[in-house]
Amino acid sequence: MELKNIVNSYNITNILGYLRRSRQDMEREKRTGEDTLTEQKELMNKILTAIEIPYELKMEIGSGESIDGRPVFKECLKDLEEGKYQAIAVKEITRLSRGSYSDAGQIVNLLQSKRLIIITPYKVYDPRNPVDMRQIRFELFMAREEFEMTRERMTGAKYTYAAQGKWISGLAPYGYQLNKKTSKLDPVEDEAKVVQLIFNIFLNGLNGKDYSYTAIASHLTNLQIPTPSGKKRWNQYTIKAILQNEVYIGTVKYKVREKTKDGKRTIRPEKEQIVVQDAHAPIIDKEQFQQSQVKIANKVPLLPNKDEFELSELAGVCTCSKCGEPLSKYESKRIRKNKDGTESVYHVKSLTCKKNKCTYVRYNDVENAILDYLSSLNDLNDSTLTKHINSMLSKYEDDNSNMKTKKQMSEHLSQKEKELKNKENFIFDKYESGIYSDELFLKRKAALDEEFKELQNAKNELNGLQDTQSEIDSNTVRNNINKIIDQYHIESSSEKKNELLRMVLKDVIVNMTQKRKGPIPAQFEITPILRFNFIFDLTATNSFH
């Protein structure tokens, strides 16, 4: 009996097709460059189209070991549990699971409880048939055993190669290339010189000035040296990663971290790590590397220098009232005709909403309006100042009413932190298994670090919100305002001025009330929102004295 007739003999109205690469598929892709997932999709489309029952294909791009590591399959199980499909189609039964026996048990229980038919290109399995059920259990069991044996062989080989100083961590790091005969790293002369330059600038600076990671990145970009991934612009994360990588002193490390049962990543005991010194030719001498690590450990933020991009005074401070987008500085060059017929060039600075173009106001006017606002607070009497701040705090609570309660906000942030830690574990797994290159890992890690930073800022704001019942000390507010304004006028660095404004202001909402008309500039209103710590903390501005 052909496949179509067998399937149609069951009461099936919808079929779910699940596509996933096997380990053999991955190895074939590496050898031949073929796209096995597309090949699998074409096969299943051909099989299921011939059956003439509505179906949907879901494709797992990754290949996780457990159900939790396969988000698409996890979603499939939920759909099957809810009865959206009466059958699941796979290239072979082993595509369903190679995870733990508990995973296999979960799948078997679902197949039996929902009486789900399994469709493969060659056979249909009915969980109500004892013979079919025995075959399903056997194949899932053998898939796990085969996976364990393969992993043991691969792990054993990796340990052996690593102990011999061979490179087994994916792509060769910047400055080296993999010697296919020895499986060890050989220096690439041009890239090695760049690595040496990075260490030299970090330790000794340039032209008598100390250089931060960002300044070094800007310097390499200005020299038009391609990044490890071939891009034009270097970033601070790549610089720091190079400075901390022991591979440049000839050391190879393997199995440094491990994942605990609760999902956290910890450093393995030293006796369990594989560390091979002098595994390949070093690019940096050990003394220079050690000096760099000491400097990194004791590093303090550096002031910007001429090679380093400097933030403007209002960077990240102002928001458009109409669309909620951040406002950015825009500087244009204009030509003015003089009465004597000559021309003169002048520059115009504006603050604009680049995305939606709904706000366009003079930059200096907004800066002055913010400073005037801060000065005006100092002129208010105690009662009016307290009333103004309480009104602002109430508005902040209203703006965050979608969270409804502080408890819900706290729970939301805790859940977000858990999600970020899971992401962190994921990218470390991919990096250590060689799936992520150094550049891709650094890019993902940098993005994740930014999310962690935003999360911490949100926690700080929530803590401030929870403390708003504290009595507002008008003297504290005035003292902090005076320090900020005085220091602002002293500073010549726009970036330091930006730090001062961001210390006191959580946001400044700019509302353009009238567009520019000829020589008459655009009219606007500002709604500043003070930071909680600035209002209540006596030491908020101490770092500037």
Curated annotation (Swiss-Prot):
Question: Mind telling me which InterPro entries this protein's record contains?
Answer: DNA_bind_recomb_sf, DNA_bind_recombinase_dom, Resolv_N, Resolvase-like_N_sf, SSR_resolvase
Under PROSITE patterns, the record lists: RECOMBINASE_DNA_BIND, RECOMBINASES_3
Domain of life (superkingdom): Bacteria
Give the gene that encodes this protein.
yokA
What's this protein's family per the entry? In the N-terminal section; belongs to the site-specific recombinase resolvase family.
Active site annotation, chain numbering: S22 (o-(5'-phospho-dna)-serine intermediate)
The keyword DNA-binding is annotated on this UniProt entry: yes
What residues are annotated to bind DNA? 173-303
- Positions of the Resolvase/invertase-type recombinase catalytic domain: 14-165
> Record's Pfam families?
Recombinase, Resolvase
Enumerate the Gene Ontology biological process terms. Answer: DNA integration; DNA recombination
GO MF, one annotated term: DNA strand exchange activity
**Protein name listed in UniProt:** Resolvase homolog YokA
Give the UniProt keywords, A-Z.
Coiled coil, DNA integration, DNA recombination, DNA-binding
Parts forming coiled coils? 19-46, 402-475
